[in-house]
């Protein structure tokens, strides 16, 4: 979870569920590490790296160095929802105990896709009754295979803005379609302070 300046308001960290928090880490500047660890949050020190494009590239490279073949990169201000049932497009807020279902599903989809996303809440009803769609834009939630992206020479830091869209489009161009889960959603509650 790339973050900066949101010391007291880690919405995504609080939303991902206890199982995910065992594996998750905030990717933050050196000066924020002590505060977050005192709050029980694991951290990765990104040093002086600034700009979400550069931070995403740092995360990809760090994951490869650590031997992670699959990772999920999340914006730091997300809450999650899911369909109430398979009969209607209506959504409900998720609870902590069920969030592992989403992460396990994303991991499973990564077995056959280089990148997996999650539908935003806005306009989500247009996807009903599908549960997964392919070849869609994705943002805020990025499950990726770092080695494949690196092997293709695709870098987040190539673009100053819209780097997530750039990487998605470059993967499409390279023949790697994505899978986007559409019966679960992300939404941005919003928080004060700098992002990423």
Residue ranges and their predicted role:
Residues 159-161, 165-196:
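C-terminal catalytic/acceptor-binding lobe
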Residues 1-3, 28, 117, 182:
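Short beta-strand/turn micro-motifs composed of small residues
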Residues 10-12, 36-37, 82-86, 126-132, ...:
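A short acidic (Asp/Glu
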Residues 6-7, 51, 77-79, 121-124, ...:
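Short, solvent-exposed loop/turn segments at secondary-structure junctions
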Residues 70-75, 114-119, 178-182:
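A structural signal for short, well-ordered beta-strand segments and their strand-loop junctions
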Residues 81-165, 173:
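Conserved catalytic core of nucleotide-sugar-dependent glycosyltransferases
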Residues 19-74, 79-91:
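Active-site-proximal specificity loops/subdomain of glycosyltransferases
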Residues 1-20, 32-37:
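Short, well-formed alpha-helical segments that are part of the catalytic scaffolds
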